[in-house]
């Protein structure tokens, strides 16, 4: 599905309950809204052009700014306000994923080795 945005357009490539993959096109000088996600991580991989990613930390007292060029990647943690600004026309892959617990296992039995 392709959706128009004030900053360009986004095309949803794949999504399920814990992961989304989008191809975005951005227009020079445009920016997305300053926003945050409650549970989702957000990743940006630039394939063409230049994109600034701003992330506000410590309740707005500190703002990190990262300039991404072709082949560069950055991530934004859940709960962090962020925004991107297009330095040039370009394209990027935008990924969203939910954090999961790597120790998410509840054992009812214990595995056994084969007898020797």
Tell where the protein language model's regions lie, with residue ranges:
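A short, N-terminal "cap"/entry segment at the start of jelly-roll beta-barrel domains
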Residues: 1-23, 31-34, 64-69, 108-116
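Double-stranded beta-helix
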Residues: 3-4, 85-116
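Catalytic phosphate/metal-binding cores of nucleic-acid and nucleotide-processing enzymes, i.e., regions
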Residues: 19, 79-83, 87-88
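Short, well-structured hydrophobic secondary-structure segments
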Residues: 24-44
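Glycine- and acidic-residue-biased ligand/ion/polar-headgroup-sensing regions
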Residues: 39-58
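Short acidic-glycine-tyrosine-enriched beta hairpin
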Residues: 57-79
